[in-house]
Amino acid sequence: MNRFKLSLLALIASLSVSTMGASIDHIQNYSAEYGGNPAQQGAINVGSTVYFNPAGLMRLENGTYIVGGIQYAFGDQNMSQGGRDFSTNLSSPIPNFALYKKTDDGAYFWTMGGVGGGAELEYKDSIPLSVNLLGNSIDFNKFLSNTHVKGSNIYAQTTLGKAFNLTDKWSASLAVRGVYGKRTLKANATVDKNVNIGDLIGKPLLRIPIFREGTASIDSEREAYGFGGQFGLNYAPNDRLNIGFRYDTKVKMKFKTKSDINDNTYGQSINIPGMSIPSLGVSDALLGLYPVYKDGEKLRRDLPALAALGASYKVTEQWTTFVGGNYYFNESATMDRIGKTNVDYKNGWEISVGSEYWFTPQIAWLVGFNYADTGAPDKSFAATEYALNSTMLGTGVKYRPNETVEWTVAFNHYIYDSRTVNDIKYEKEISSIGINFVKKF
C-alpha cells in the first residue's frame, strides 16, 4: 500500500518545478541581458558581468555602478493522460539588483536576485491521478471532485565579494553567497461518496470504504537558508579575447516544513486474506505520509554546485561574439527523499552562443541561443518535479544615451522537449521579457 500512497504523492509534488530551470532547481537568468544573449560567462559589460563573471569586473572602467532590472516570465505547463489535459498558466516577475565599485586596487560587489525555482503554478481542475493498485490501474479523478492544487518554488540569493588583479592579464574574485529557499504547496479535494475497495479492484460486493465521503486539504510551507562560496578567474590575453570562469559551491539547505492538514475522509482499515490496508484518508494518499510535507519535517534539498566557463571575442570594434557553458553537479547534492527512496539525478549541462553588434555608439543588437540538459531522469518525473530539457532563443537591444547610462531590453522563448513517463505526457512553453538599467558614477 505504501507504493500506492507514494505514487499519488509523486504526482502532486510535480508542482515543485523550476519555471525556466537550467538544471533541476537552478535558473540562470540573473539579468535581462541574459535573455538577449545567454552566453555571458566570459562577457565584459557593465550590466551583467557582476553576476556571471565577477572576476572580469577588473576589466571595466573605474567607477561606482548601480544595476537594476526585472524580467517577467509567462507561459503554460501541461500534463496530459488518457486524452485529458491538466494545464496551468504561469506568470512570474524576477527582479535583480547589483552595486559595485571598481578601482585600480580591486572591485567590491554586491548582488541580489533569483537563483532558482520559478513561478507559482495553479491547477484548478486536478492533475493526473492514475495509480496502479493491487494490479489494477485506478483513475482517482473518477472518485474526487473540486481537486485544486497550487505550488510554488522560489530561491533568492545575495552575493558579497571582491575582485582583484593577479597580473595585467589575470584577475580573480572571491565571494560569499546567502540563499533563501521557500517551497509551498496547497491542495484540496472532495470525495463525493464513499469509495469502496471493491470499486477499485473490480469486486463490487466487497463494500468496505477505503475513503469516506468528505473533504481533505493541506497547506504546507517549507523554508531553508544556506550559505556558500563563489570563486572566479578572468583571463584577457589581448584587447579582443576574454575568457571567464566561475565556480559556485554547493549550498546545503535543510528545509523545515510547517503543514496544516484537515481530513474527514478516513476509511475503514482492511485486514482480510491477501489484503491488509490501514485506515486511510485522502490526505494520506495526497501528502500526509510524504516526508517532505509532514509538519515539522526537516529534509535536505541542496542547491547543487555550478561551474561556468565562457569566452568573448571582439571580431571588429562593433561586433563581439560569445560562447559559454555551465555544468551542474547534481549528483553530489543531497535532494529530497520519498521515504527511503532516493532519486539519482544526473549532472546537468548547458551550452550557449551569442552576438552583440553596435550599429551606432548608442544602439546595439543582441541575439543568442542556449541548450540545457537538466540531468533529470525519468524516475524523478514520478517523484518531485519534471525538469524538461530546453532550447532557448533570445534577442534584445542595448541603448546608451550617454557614457554613464545603459538600458537593455530583451525577449526570449524556451522550447521544451516533451517527455512521456508512466503514460503522462509533460510539456512546457515559456517566454520572458526583461529590462535592465545601469548607472555609472
Model-derived regions, located:
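Repeated loop/turn-to-beta-strand initiation elements of outer-membrane beta-barrel proteins
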Residues: T64, D105-Y108, K169-A172, R240-I243, ...
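Residue-level signature of outer-membrane beta-barrel architecture
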Residues: M58, K101-T103, K162-F164, F231, ...
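Extracellular loop and loop/strand-boundary signature of outer-membrane beta-barrel proteins
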Residues: S80-D85, K142-H148, G214-S220, Y293-E297, ...
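N-terminal, post-signal peptide beta-strand-biased segments of exported outer-membrane/organellar beta-barrel
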Residues: V17-E120, T384-Y386
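Residues that define the transmembrane beta-barrel architecture of outer-membrane proteins
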Residues: S48-V50, N89-P95, S152-T158, E223-G229, ...
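Transmembrane beta-barrel strands of outer-membrane/channel proteins
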Residues: G68-Y72, W110-G114, L174-Y180, F245-T249, ...
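Outer-membrane beta-barrel "beta-signal"
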Residues: V397-P401, K428-F441
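Solvent-exposed loop segments that connect transmembrane elements
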Residues: K124-S145, R183-D219, F255-G296, A333-N342
